[in-house]
């Protein structure tokens, strides 16, 4: 989902990322491909106006998401389909939805680098990440292991 998307959703749902990756690999050699990783999240706002749902969003940093969750205290659940935590809360007549990019979601996405033996990773946007993201990337990008070894070592994260 993108900034002007008419429907709220994840900016990089795990299944969508992997499906797109497989499609790109049909034309681009794996040793030339960097996997894009989002260091941001969108906070989606849905409002009912004149009987229609108006959707808008704002891109925020991982730190800002933590602040919102701390202030609003929504229930945060693991969304298996997106490979992300999801939170939703109401404020006035609006419903806010957040598919959270964090160390767990980035861990799962960056595992695709090993699974498909890619050249590496790129990210958007530097400064929007939390400190723990660098530890995840250090573990996943510098350690030489294949996907099966990664999956075995990270079985709790992959579940």
Enumerate the predicted regions with their spans:
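Hydrophobic, secondary-structure "cap" segments at the distal end of domains
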Residues: 58-116
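Soluble non-cytosolic domains of exported or imported proteins
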Residues: 11-18, 100-107, 128
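Aromatic-rich peripheral "rim/lid" segments of glycoside hydrolase catalytic domains that contact
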Residues: 112, 127-159
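Conserved, mostly hydrophobic/aromatic
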Residues: 35, 113, 121
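Substrate-binding surface in catalytic domains of secreted glycosidases
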Residues: 1-69
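Aromatic/acidic polysaccharide-binding cleft in carbohydrate-active enzymes
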Residues: 36, 45-51, 124-137
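Solvent-exposed, polar/charged alpha-helical surfaces in well-ordered, non-transmembrane soluble domains
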Residues: 18-22, 107-111, 115, 135
């Amino acid at each position: 989902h993108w900034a002007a998307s008419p429907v709220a959703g994840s900016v990089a749902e795990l299944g969508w990322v992997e499906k797109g990756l497989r499609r790109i690999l049909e034309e681009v050699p794996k040793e030339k491909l960097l996997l894009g990783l989002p260091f941001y999240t969108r906070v989606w706002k849905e409002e009912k106006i004149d009987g229609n749902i108006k959707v808008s969003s704002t891109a925020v940093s991982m730190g800002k998401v933590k602040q919102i969750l701390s202030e609003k205290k929504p229930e945060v659940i693991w969304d298996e389909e997106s490979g992300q935590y999801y939170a939703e809360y109401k404020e006035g007549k609006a419903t806010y939805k957040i598919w959270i990019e964090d160390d767990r979601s980035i861990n799962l996405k960056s595992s695709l680098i090993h699974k498909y033996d890619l050249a590496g990773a790129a990210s958007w946007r530097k400064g929007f990440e939390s400190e723990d993201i660098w530890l995840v990337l250090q573990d996943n990008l510098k350690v030489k292991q294949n996907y099966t070894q990664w999956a075995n070592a990270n079985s709790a994260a992959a579940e």
